[in-house]
Amino acid sequence: MFIAYIAITLLFGLLVYLLRRHRAGNLALLLFTLCLCFTSLEAYYRFFYLKSDGMGRLMKNFSDRYYQYDSHGLRASHLPLSRTKDNLIVLGDSHVFGAGLKHPAERFSELLTQHYPALHVVNLGLPGWDTKTETAQFRKYVGETDGRVALVILTYFYNDIEEEATPADRARDPSPDPPAKETALDHALQFASKYSRFVEMIYYRLGYPRLVRDRLGQIQRFYSDPVVRERHLATLEQFRELLQERYSARLLIVLLPYLHSESLLQQTKFYQMFEQALAQGGFDFISMQPVFATQGVEKLWVNRFDPHTNPFANRLVANAIIEHLNQHPEVLLTPRVTP
């Protein structure tokens, strides 16, 4: 497709030459200039732009350059489990995967590997995984292992509850923000985005967000809905029981707050509501919101368009986990099953 941009630009360049002594030459020059500018921008975003983005489709160059997958389809997972060391498994979505990070070594799971050389730390994470998917993927990758699993760290983000919502729940808990309707311009730009990386970048950063702004408000309402919340807690309980019964492993949940904006990060009461529900359920958890709130989103996110945790935020997560395990050393003790 990019060849077509070059061909059209050259065509207008030829017209400028052919019409140089004609009035239409000025129009040809204008069109040539516009085409040259557009083609240059297209070339930049298509071949040279390397910033990460919270929307996966806008970070193709970044992901192609920095995301390498192992034979298990994961990013430096360190599978299979060790049979000689106790295993610590970090499970989650894009935050565990290391979205926005250039090197896997910047992930908090790798920092735990450095701190606990006696443990084999496994990273199970891919963008888009929710709690139910994470449970299924844990079964897939760990299965009936002979390795001892001491601890599973489930990295939790505040959209995982959305998987539990039924159509009836969505009707009962509408978003406080009215949904925006797609216009003819939206359809036109979405179509053009299939053929232009420049249009795609501009539209999905500036125009598209308004179409999904209502989603976050509805997700937050699900956490306030006791029916949806209890259903979600039951999913977490099922996973905890799986770990205890099949692997004699403990579960530690690390709660990551929103980094999309400062106001979302500072919604302490919202986060505390779910933390209280976890505490009542007897879950062992670490909330990163109080720690992150003292720093501010600009120190924690990858960039303004990518609210994933940056290397500094990953270090804070690793430090919080290490501090928690220092205070509760029994968490890493693996029960030995007597034959």
List the predicted regions and their residue ranges:
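Conserved SGNH/GDSL esterase-like catalytic core that processes O-acyl groups on lipids
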Residues: 99-180
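Internal/C-terminal transmembrane anchor helices
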Residues: 24-45
